A protein has these predicted regions:
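Residue-level signal for short, function-critical loop segments
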Residues: 16, 59, 96
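Helicase C-terminal subdomain and adjacent C-terminal extension
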Residues: 27, 63-136
Length: 136
């Protein structure tokens, strides 16, 4: 297949502006990504638009046994925007264990349902564990 015909619009969604700015600056210096149509934005900036491929960067991760609340990223309306913008492929980047165990003010952590759905439907979804600074 001709690789030139495999051009996809890619969106990277993150809840926080500071993370958006960091990702934007990192991708701008990588010349190998200039051939791709990549838009990086916050959840709010993707409201009403979609892309072939969406990468949702949850940002949050465990920090030395600290019980963190994830209310901002767990807001169901914002999460709905983040997870419903992909036409062909959705990639969620995050610390799965942390997101599963994190607390929300209303005791309703939507990531529990998302992760359980992924685990129950392994023929449709894939979890890839990657090393990193917070990997255990």
């Amino acid at each position: 297949m001709d690789e030139r015909k495999l051009k996809y619009d890619i969106g990277v969604i993150t809840p926080y502006k500071a993370q958006k700015d960091l990702l934007t600056s990192r991708l701008q210096v990588k010349k190998k990504y200039k051939a791709y149509s990549i838009d990086i934005g916050t959840v709010d900036s993707f409201q009403g638009s979609d892309r072939d491929i969406i990468i949702y960067d949850c940002v949050r991760a465990a920090q030395q046994n600290r019980k963190a609340k994830i209310d901002f990223i767990a807001d169901e309306k914002r999460l709905n925007v983040s997870l419903s913008r992909a036409k062909k492929l959705l990639i969620i980047v995050g610390d799965m264990k942390f997101l599963y165990q994190a607390q929300c003010s209303d005791a309703n952590n939507p990531f529990v349902r998302i992760i359980e759905c992924i685990n129950k439907n392994k023929e449709s979804y894939e979890i890839v564990e990657m090393g990193g600074r917070n990997a255990r």
